[in-house]
């Protein structure tokens, strides 16, 4: 990890749980990353949370393996392909050697199991040879759960004693297909004793959808609002995930205040890349595991 990086420590999980979300800083994709420490210093000044939230701590120079969930900051890309920085997606057209090097830079990289995500509702228990899934569960310290995102909602879950963990990739398809509920069936702990963290994702002010998609989630409170353009709606995926978690019995849910679309200088955003006429974009990763 370079000295230009900053971390926000998320202290909602037990001390023996490692959990973090990467951003775009410190990678090798596009071979042209420059020092963005001045921008980073302005960007990271704490975080907002919901429910029984704890205040984040902005620190410099602390190992990413020291505590719990962390956001690693970055800079904005220029060019035709939005890979610049710590892209960990091997399926988006980036140079595979760069992606492998970026993955190797992640904390506890040797323990991470990478999924082939398909926007479904399959959850696998690690270790497993079957990796076509959108969520993973682990109760072993040698096997860390991870999901890649670039607007979709990453959800990290642990029991309050730090014995079981899960990582969930929840786009609208996964949320509709009850992937969160599927993941909870793997825990031996009662949902009331679980802790969930909803990571950076596209916010409800930036995710415009058509009426057909909006109607799929119309029964969620304050998560679908008409947009100015006729026939278009704004859909709030993070808060849909939050309502699902709460409905399933989880009492301690925290939300990142970062929007991947608004802060494409810090995160990869598929929708922002599309609107900016990029051919492709990278992926961040959310990781959770047991020490």
Placement of each model-derived feature along the sequence:
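Active-site microenvironment for binding and transforming phosphate-containing groups
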Residues: 1-50, 59-291
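Noncatalytic, beta-rich nucleic-acid-contacting surfaces in large DNA/RNA-processing enzymes
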Residues: 53
């Amino acid at each position: 990890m370079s000295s230009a990086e900053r971390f926000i420590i998320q202290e909602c999980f037990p001390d023996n749980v490692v959990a973090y979300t990467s951003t775009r800083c410190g990678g090798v994709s596009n071979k042209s990353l420059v020092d963005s420490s001045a921008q980073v210093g302005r960007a990271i000044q704490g975080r907002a949370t919901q429910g029984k939230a704890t205040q984040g701590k902005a620190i410099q120079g602390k190992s990413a393996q020291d505590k719990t969930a962390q956001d690693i900051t970055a800079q904005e890309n220029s060019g035709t392909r939005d890979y610049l920085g710590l892209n960990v997606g091997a399926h988006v057209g980036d140079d595979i050697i760069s992606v492998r090097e970026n993955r190797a830079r992640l904390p506890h990289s040797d323990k991470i199991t990478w999924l082939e995500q398909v926007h479904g509702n399959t959850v696998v228990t690690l270790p497993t040879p079957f990796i076509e899934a959108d969520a993973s569960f682990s109760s072993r310290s040698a096997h860390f759960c991870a999901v890649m995102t670039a607007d979709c909602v990453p959800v990290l879950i642990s029991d309050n004693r730090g014995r079981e963990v899960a990582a969930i990739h929840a786009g609208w398809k996964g949320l509709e297909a009850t992937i969160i509920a599927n993941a909870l069936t793997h825990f031996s702990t009662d949902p009331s004793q679980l802790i969930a963290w909803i990571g950076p994702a596209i916010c409800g002010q930036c995710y415009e959808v058509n009426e057909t998609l909006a109607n799929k989630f119309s029964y969620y409170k304050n998560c679908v609002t008409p947009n100015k353009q006729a026939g278009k709606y704004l859909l709030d995926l993070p808060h849909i995930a939050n309502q699902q978690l709460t409905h399933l019995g989880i009492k301690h849910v925290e939300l990142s205040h970062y929007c991947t679309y608004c802060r494409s200088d810090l995160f990869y955003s598929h929708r922002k890349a599309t609107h900016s006429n990029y051919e492709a974009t990278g992926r961040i990763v959310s990781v959770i595991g047991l020490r």
